[in-house]
Amino acid sequence: MRFADRPTTEVDVFVAAPPERIWPLVSEINTPSQFGTELQKAVWLEVEGLEGPPPCPGARFTGHNFHAARGEWQTTNVIIDCEPNQVFAWAVGDDPSFPAATWRYELTPEGDGTRLRFRAQMGPGPSGMTAVIEQMPDKEERIIARRLDEWAANMTATLTGIKEQAEDGA
C-alpha cells in the first residue's frame, strides 16, 4: 500500500436510533475530541460570503491535534459535504481539491436504527506523514499501515461514543 494509492480506512456501527438523533453528534466538529486521542479540539473559523452557518459546505475550522510521536500541530479543515441526517464530510488542508486527508460520516437508515459509517482517506495532498515517508521511503507501507490502524482505533472509539450518546437519548 502506497500513499499514491490514497489509502483508506472505514469503520461502521449499528446505532439503535434514527439519523435525526445521530446527526447533531456527527455534525459537531468536537465530537471526535471527546472519544479519540488525537484531535484535542476544533474551532470554527469565520469565512466571508458563507451561505449559512456552519457546518455548511465551505465552512472552515482549525483542528488542534496531538500525537505522542509528533507532538502538537494544527490543521485547517473545510466542510465539503453536508446533507443533514445523511452525510457530513471535511477535507484537511487549505485546498479541498488537494487535501492531506478526507474524513466522512454516512448515516443510512437500517431497520429500527441507523448504520453509521466513518471513512478516512489519505492524500493526495502532503501531510506530516508524507514528510516521514520521504525520509524513509523503504518503510512507506509499514508507516501507512500503522497510521491507518491508529486512525481506525480513534474512529472506532468515536463511533462507540456516538452510539452510546445517541442510544442514551432514546
Identify the residue ranges that each predicted region occupies:
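Hydrophobic ligand-binding cavity/cleft-lining segments
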Residues: 1-56
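Generic structural detector for well-ordered beta-strands
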Residues: 12-16, 78, 106
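Hydrophobic beta-strand positions in extracellular immunoglobulin-like domains
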Residues: 15, 65, 120-122
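Structural motif
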Residues: 16, 82-84, 110
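Short amphipathic alpha-helical segments
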Residues: 18-21, 150, 154
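Hydrophobic pocket/interface hotspot
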Residues: 21-26, 32, 61, 79, ...
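Glycine-rich portal/gate segments that line the openings of hydrophobic small-molecule binding cavities
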Residues: 44-98, 102, 153-170
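Beta-strand/loop substructures that line and gate deep hydrophobic ligand-binding cavities in soluble
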Residues: 93-153
